């Protein structure tokens, strides 16, 4: 990489660290190219991204960001997985790490919080923002549906009573 390319890469990575909901750092030594491509495609499908960066450039890019506390994670062959949704990157990384023991999660960050391996695992078990929004909408709609049912019930009962009287009059 030439110096200008490095500057551009550091700027791009700095923007990633500032805009991401969560960042996960992992060692990938021993992961084959096919496995890495599979991992990248799974992350892309979920709405995240995986980048391999030189540790020195990643540490420079971390300066001045909320994620600056995770600079000590960048040792050895590291990759960076990130997403806007704070749950997506940890979930995809942990799912891939279950099936591939060569991918070793080192930690990460979410906003100003530096995450340990256990914290990344905990984040991976949480539902995504879209799932939480769906649950919230369902919880909000349930009382409205019940109120509508209660309000309609007396009218339905009256209609059945009138229908019964009408049938009774026709029969007589």
Curated annotation (Swiss-Prot):
Keywords: Ribonucleoprotein, Ribosomal protein, RNA-binding, rRNA-binding. One of its GO terms (molecular function) is structural constituent of ribosome. InterPro entries: Ribosomal_uL10, Ribosomal_uL10-like_sf, Ribosomal_uL10_bac, Ribosomal_uL10_bac_type, Ribosomal_uL10_CS_bac. One of its GO terms (cellular component) is large ribosomal subunit. It holds the Pfam family Ribosomal_L10. It comes from the Bacteria. Transmembrane segments: none annotated. GO terms for biological process: translation. The keyword Amino-acid biosynthesis does not apply. The keyword RNA-binding applies. Part of the ribosomal stalk of the 50S ribosomal subunit. The N-terminus interacts with L11 and the large rRNA to form the base of the stalk. The C-terminus forms an elongated spine to which L12 dimers bind in a sequential fashion forming a multimeric L10(L12)X complex. PANTHER family: 39S RIBOSOMAL PROTEIN L10, MITOCHONDRIAL. Belongs to the universal ribosomal protein uL10 family. Forms part of the ribosomal stalk, playing a central role in the interaction of the ribosome with GTP-bound translation factors. This is Large ribosomal subunit protein uL10. It comes from Allorhizobium ampelinum (strain ATCC BAA-846 / DSM 112012 / S4). The lineage of its organism: Bacteria, Pseudomonadati, Pseudomonadota, Alphaproteobacteria, Hyphomicrobiales. The gene is rplJ.
């Amino acid at each position: 990489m030439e110096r200008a390319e490095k500057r551009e890469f550091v700027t791009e990575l700095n923007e990633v660290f500032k805009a991401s909901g969560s960042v996960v750092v992992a060692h990938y030594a021993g992961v084959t190219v096919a496995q890495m491509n599979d991992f990248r495609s799974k992350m892309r499908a979920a709405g995240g991204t995986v980048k391999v960066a030189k540790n020195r450039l990643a540490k420079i890019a971390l300066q001045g960001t909320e994620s600056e506390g995770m600079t000590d994670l960048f040792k050895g062959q590291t990759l960076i997985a990130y997403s806007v949704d704070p749950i997506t990157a940890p979930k995809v990384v942990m799912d891939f790490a279950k099936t591939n023991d060569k991918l070793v999660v080192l930690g990460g960050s979410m906003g100003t919080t530096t995450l340990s391996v256990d914290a990344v695992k905990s984040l991976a078990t949480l539902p995504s923002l879209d799932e939480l929004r769906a649950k919230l909408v369902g919880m909000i709609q349930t009382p409205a549906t019940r109120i509508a049912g209660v309000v309609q019930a007396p009218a339905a009962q009256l209609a059945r009573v009138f229908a019964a009287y009408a049938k009774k009059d026709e029969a007589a």
